[in-house]
Swiss-Prot record:
The chain crosses the membrane at residues 72-96. It comes from Saccharomyces cerevisiae (strain ATCC 204508 / S288c). It holds the Pfam family SH3_1. This is Nuclear fusion protein FUS1. Required for cell fusion. Negatively regulates Sho1p signaling to ensure efficient cell fusion. Interacts with SHO1.
Length: 512
């Protein structure tokens, strides 16, 4: 294919050259005569016709195939060539970079200078760029050889990694000083003239250390850890039990914020006069509180009004009424005055006598609640009495226990006056008798349920009261149901149904 392309190109160039030569000669001859120009043109046409036509057309037909093949070859080969060329550039770059790092940090030798050894070990490519540098540094190599000869290292397997330095500066001897002593005479406390020469023998050093740390430490005094006995206190001292003051107060004079934690500057010693001169607590330190045992507190130490303030409500009435002669509370030996029983008045309750819980030392009696209802015709004058009955003990009590119980009873009476118990709320009905359990009532007003536990009742229906509440709501069961009464447990989910539920008590009236 390449030979055909070359042959076609040669043929075309030859034809063009022949045509240009012929045209030039014809142009010159046309100036002389016009007749000769016609003959020249005819000759040109004849020469062109005489050219083999099959060769020209075959070359022209083969030309598109050759151009398409070259285009495909360039489109494939050009990217591959560019990629290979770039890869070659990258490899050369990394190679030069690695050599530059090794040039800046060559391996160190003990006998040969650094630059000379590196110039010897580099390859021909590196020496090509760094030859001038090695030649310039060779002049300084002779000057450095003497230094390396002076510090000749042991080469081979016996080479050591230890480096020795020659220091001409004198060594300053070490010394230990106490805070209150000077540098010139650090061991004056021992009474011996000990030198600080570093050449002192080891035996003397051991003696100095032992004396300084254990035998005679400076500014430290032995303190006895014994505490004074109870007989040494000023309040318990007698003429025969006089003793001298503690040795601690004569020797110790150090003050610190932590002294009170070690019983050195605390107020404990000050209270009993054990430390009046030397034991001093800093003024800025907080004072410790005096400790007093509960068994030694006098009766008037606490103020009763401060411990138990009056918490009575100002809106309540307080009228002291005497007790009846036959009251069961008076059976306790008449230890409680009548004025300590408090009564309260309310619109619905004529008189409620509140008494404290029965408290007998070591036992708790059963508490009962008595409620008296009058006839429903006189419901406006009903009286409710709540009494807490305190039974007498079965066994006779000792005098001390009786006295203790009387004091406790008085204390409870005081509490009952200062902190009265709340009253039980009472339901109100508009002049009607209270609802009684187990009786049948008539519905006088329709009611539609609003909650899940309520039922619908209509005017004229008969219901039976099962339970009542202080707010006026009642649990009822319809009596005129066709299904009859269903006995279901209270814990069962079917206990509340369409015929058994909650209704307001105002919608009910007693059935005659």
């Amino acid at each position: 294919m390449v030979a055909t392309i070359m042959q076609t190109t040669t043929t075309v160039l030859t034809t063009v050259a022949a045509m240009s030569t012929t045209l030039a000669s014809n142009y010159i001859s046309s100036q002389a005569s016009s007749s000769t120009s016609v003959t020249t043109v005819t000759t040109i046409a004849t020469s062109i016709r005489s050219t083999p036509s099959n060769l020209l057309f075959s070359n022209v037909a083969a030309q598109p195939k050759s151009s398409s093949a070259s285009t495909i070859g360039l489109s494939i080969g050009l990217p591959i060539g560019i990629f290979c060329f770039g890869l070659l550039i990258l490899l050369c770059y990394f190679y030069l970079k690695r050599n530059s790092v090794s040039i800046s940090n060559p391996p160190m030798s003990a006998t040969i200078p650094r630059e000379e050894e590196y110039c010897r070990r580099t390859n021909w490519f590196s020496r090509l760029f760094w030859q001038s540098k090695c030649e310039d540094q060779n002049s300084y190599s002779n000057r450095d050889i003497e230094k390396y000869n002076d510090t000749q290292w042991t080469s081979g397997d016996n080479m050591s990694s230890k480096i020795q330095y020659k220091i001409s500066k004198p060594i300053i001897p070490q010394h230990i000083l106490t805070p209150k002593k000077t540098v010139k005479n650090p061991y004056a406390w021992s009474g011996k003239n000990i030198s600080l020469d570093p050449k002192v023998n080891e035996m003397e050093e051991e003696k100095v250390v032992d004396a300084f740390l254990y035998t005679k430490p400076p500014n430290i005094v032995h303190i006895e850890s014994s505490m004074p006995s109870y007989n040494d206190l000023p309040s318990q001292k007698t003429v025969s039990s006089k003793k001298t003051a503690l040795k601690t107060s004569e020797k110790w004079s150090y003050e610190s914020p932590l002294s009170r934690w070690f019983l050195r500057g605390s107020t404990y010693f000050k209270d009993y006069g054990l430390s009046k001169t030397s034991l001093k607590t800093p003024t800025g330190a907080p004072q410790l509180k005096q400790m007093k045992m509960l068994s030694r507190i006098s009766k008037g130490y606490f103020n009763e009004s401060d411990i138990m303030p009056d918490e009575r409500s100002p809106i309540l009435e307080y009228n002291n009424t005497p007790l009846d002669a036959n009251d069961s509370v008076n059976n306790l030996g008449n230890t409680t005055p009548d004025s300590q029983i408090t009564s309260y008045r309310n619109n619905n309750i004529d008189l409620i006598t509140a008494r404290p819980h029965s408290v007998i030392y070591g036992t708790t009696a059963q508490q009962t609640l008595e409620t008296n209802f009058n006839d429903h015709h006189d419901c406006n004058k009903s009286t409710e009495k709540h009494e807490l009955i305190i039974p007498t003990p079965s066994k006779p009590l000792k005098k001390r226990k009786k006295r203790r119980q009387s004091k406790m009873y008085q204390h409870l009476q005081h509490l009952s006056r200062s902190k009265p118990l709340p009253l039980t709320p009472n339901s109100k009905y508009n002049g009607e008798a209270s609802v009684q359990l187990g009786k049948t009532y008539t519905v006088i007003q329709d009611y539609e349920p609003r909650l899940t536990d309520e039922i619908r009742i209509s005017l004229g229906e008969k219901v039976k009261i099962l339970a009542t509440h202080t707010d006026g709501w009642c649990l009822v069961e319809k009596c005129n149901t066709q299904k009859g009464s269903i006995h279901v447990s209270v814990d069962d989910k079917r206990y509340l149904n369409e015929d058994r539920g909650i209704v307001p008590g105002d919608c009910l009236q007693e059935y005659d």
